[in-house]
């Protein structure tokens, strides 16, 4: 019984560890460090005394800052979920606590789901991807 529980947690740990390279790839694909630098530059612009004189520019800067912060926050939340899931697995495995298996499974699934969503969002982050689209379907061979 205890061996079975330990095996289940080991499988979960391996499943979670397989996601780590994809999470690291996502960090470089998003360009988290570059985005943080850009946020700092935009916040410096917003702190300038003449920032509000050009309303269009100020709104664009604030909107861009908000979008960039959302990207970084989403990535950081993914990393936090990864760490929390790993901690749950380690604690449950050390204590041979079968009651935490459902929670650990759920945590790993959440990390997988969030990772896939962020990968898709990263793929659809081009200049025009935030715009609406009109699709037309035509019958034919």
Label every model-predicted segment:
Residues 2-133:
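Charged, heptad-repeat coiled-coil alpha-helices that serve as long linker/dimerization "arms"
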Residues 133-141:
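Short, hydrophobic beta-strand segments
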